[in-house]
Amino acid sequence: MEVHAHTHTARKKWTHYFWEFLMLFLAVFCGFLAEYQLEHKIEKDRGKQYIISFFQDLKYDTSHLTAVMNNYKEKVENLSAISKCYDSVLANLLCKNCLSKLFKGSRGFFELRTSDRTMQQLKNAGGLRLLKSADADSVIVYDNLIRGYKLDETTTFQETQTTLRSISDELFNYAVVKDGEFTDGDILITSDKLIINKFFNALNRYVKYSALYINKLERLKSEAVNIMNYFNKKYHIE
């Protein structure tokens, strides 16, 4: 009967297991770093895309801000002779020339419409966290200015416009002013100086608010241009 000698495998030293563990750890760690870097790059790219999109929104906004501003400037110009017209009307209720200009200049106003597609994405999709702190601050400041202006527009100025329109209905002859162009006939349907005075008081407030909104629009446009220059210099968008 043959007896086979058992083959003894040399026992591995602890250093062998240490190096195996270290290599495995490094492989996992490097994989984690690679994944982290990839996610970081993806988020950085997404953040830049938001900036580019917001930049395009600002280009639209500046164009529309200019149009609205010019509309208000035209109003203020057309309504600049309020005091002289008031004196003329009290002296002659048939005075038509100055009233025609005041009537046209106080009809309606340009609503400020801004492009908020990127802003909504930044807010609703958590996009603000992808922006650098200074970039996010610029976006938030501009958004606050826009929302503040639109709040004034839909409250204070709209109320002033509504009041003026209501008084105009009591004062002007529909048959003469219905097409926006004054035709022959008596322009006023009342000689009540109280109503005439109310109209000019409301008109005076309207002019003051128009001048105030010109300043606000100029500030908004200046802020938009500054942000565009800042982003363009930082990210070379154009």
Which residues fall in each region the model found?
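Long, hydrophobic alpha-helical segments that serve as membrane-spanning/inserting helices
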Residues: 1-15, 36-238
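Hydrophobic membrane-insertion alpha-helices, especially the h-region
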Residues: 20-34
